Amino acid sequence: MTVLNRMDTLAEDMVADITDSPTGYTGVDGDAQWAAEVRRLAKLRGATILAHNYQLPEIQDVADHVGDSLALSRIAAEAPEDTIVFCGVHFMAETAKILSPDKTVLIPDQRAGCSLADSITPEDLRAWKDEHPGAVVVSYFNTTAAVKALTDICCTSSNAVDVVASIDPDREVLFCPDQFLGAHVRRMTGRENLHVWAGECHVHAGINGDELGERARANPDAELFVHPECGCATSALYLAGEGAFPAERVKILSTGGMLDAANTTSARKVLVATEVGMLYQLRRAAPQVDFQAVNDRASCRYMKMITPAALLRCLVEGADEVHVDPGIAAAGRRSVQRMIEIGQPGGGE
């Protein structure tokens, strides 16, 4: 990947201030001068900038497109630009490469991993499949390219129930890697031959039922937007089931579903159980609504590794480029295509 001539850019002084550490690149403020330079460098490189909903506000503001991982991967495939800068975690950039094999895909910091995607390896999945010969493997979109390549059908949080329901009821199903989304699918389908991998997103798992219940009872007129990866999703449904909270105000939603619901809600206050970066998009979508985090400490350190310094470095140096083995990419692409053939995949995570 070409390194831009720094002597021809206003970024020269800013790049000189960048420092690297295990927690990411720092030394640059996401101010107006930085934003203008990022946009100029992206144009010089012929790149489009994509940012996930959980990114820092300044990264979301400078991006050409903001959304969930599936929506952004589709945008990457359709974009006229030959270079994609994916501001998100590594599996998301991999997925963009799977769906856009002929494009250059960059991630501002390749160390931005994902605890959920890392909770199952290809070796784990092969061993699990050996224990259940003939089972259909359904993998959440939040998986590595290598796991997608061993998957029969991918799913998103908004279509996981429909994907599993489409499978022959006599076939065993291996659902990975998120145990909370898997529990939600089992609850909605009533399927007893659904085996669920014990993986989790460390951020969503940390939003517990006790704090959700406490916040809900303290705000009886609020709506609840709960991501299905949350450890508190079952508690949210229990609150509705026992009558402690009106069922119509408890909504289990993907990030895309949350944005749709934000645009139509009549509630004055909404309690949100997901990564706190989502609040920025929700508040922009419906500024008249008071969106509050159920847990304001629910911040993904990997998402926040995509800093202003990292994005500037990425555009100057053309780093870090994402590569996926062509065979793995082809197999992973098939599992995503099968999901799309079943029906509208909706939002990603």
From Swiss-Prot:
Superkingdom per UniProt: Bacteria
Gene Ontology MF terms: 4 iron, 4 sulfur cluster binding; metal ion binding; quinolinate synthetase A activity
Compartments (UniProt record): Cytoplasm
GO BP annotations listed: 'de novo' NAD biosynthetic process from L-aspartate
EC number of this enzyme: 2.5.1.72
Reaction(s) catalysed by this chain's protein: iminosuccinate + dihydroxyacetone phosphate = quinolinate + phosphate + 2 H2O + H(+)
Pfam families: NadA (PF02445)
Residue numbers binding iminosuccinate: 52, 69, 140-142, 157, 227-229, 255
Keyword field: 4Fe-4S, Cytoplasm, Iron, Iron-sulfur, Metal-binding, Pyridine nucleotide biosynthesis, Transferase
Binding site for [4Fe-4S] cluster: 114, 201, 300
Enzyme class: transferase
Main location: cytoplasm
Pathway recorded for this protein: Cofactor biosynthesis; NAD(+) biosynthesis; quinolinate from iminoaspartate: step 1/1
Cofactor note: Binds 1 [4Fe-4S] cluster per subunit.
Family: Belongs to the quinolinate synthase family. Type 2 subfamily.
NCBIfam families for the chain: nadA (TIGR00550), PRK09375.1-2 (NF006878), PRK09375.1-4 (NF006879)
Identification of the protein by name: Quinolinate synthase
